[in-house]
Amino acid sequence: MTDYYYPVLSDETSLPLYVLGIGARDREFHFVREDGYPNHQIIYCTRGQGHIIFDGHEYDIKPGDAFYLPPSVPHEYYPVGDIWETHWITFEGREAIEMLKHIKLEKAKVFHINDINAVDAIFKKILYLMKCVPTFPPKQDTSSTVSKKK
């Protein structure tokens, strides 16, 4: 499944935590980000294998493994083999740092998710809910303004 969503934000940026993007890829791309990414990222593997490099360390990423990258941390990641399916979320907010401290993600880190099914269910709910958020500007109903030709 390759699916993603980047909401158009307005007042949401005043919230303590907000999603900037969320998605899933059948085959993750090869990314080299010398200046890092501008927002917090959490990426986890659902199938296949990948490799990530940050802070001078290299890690193999397998199903159930995840990594957190704070903003502006230089990194590189890429698939190993033909399949590397990932799910990812990017976020910000004035309480993002406190939330991350609470779950012990204070710096770039690779970790294993013990209950991948529970995390995947939450991920799918967030993706669904993000798609329900109206876009800005809202689409206008033009059905009542159609003119008839004589």
What are the functions of these language-model segments?
Residues 23, 90-92, 114:
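Residues at the C-termini of beta-strands that transition into short coil/loop
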Residues 20, 86-91, 140-142:
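Short glycine/serine/threonine-enriched helix-capping/active-site loop
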Residues 62, 97-98:
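DNA-contacting interfaces and partner/effector-binding or oligomerization modules
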Residues 1-60, 65, 81, 103-110:
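Generic protein-terminus/edge-of-domain signal
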Residues 99-150:
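Amphipathic alpha-helical segments enriched in hydrophobic/aromatic residues interleaved with Lys/Arg
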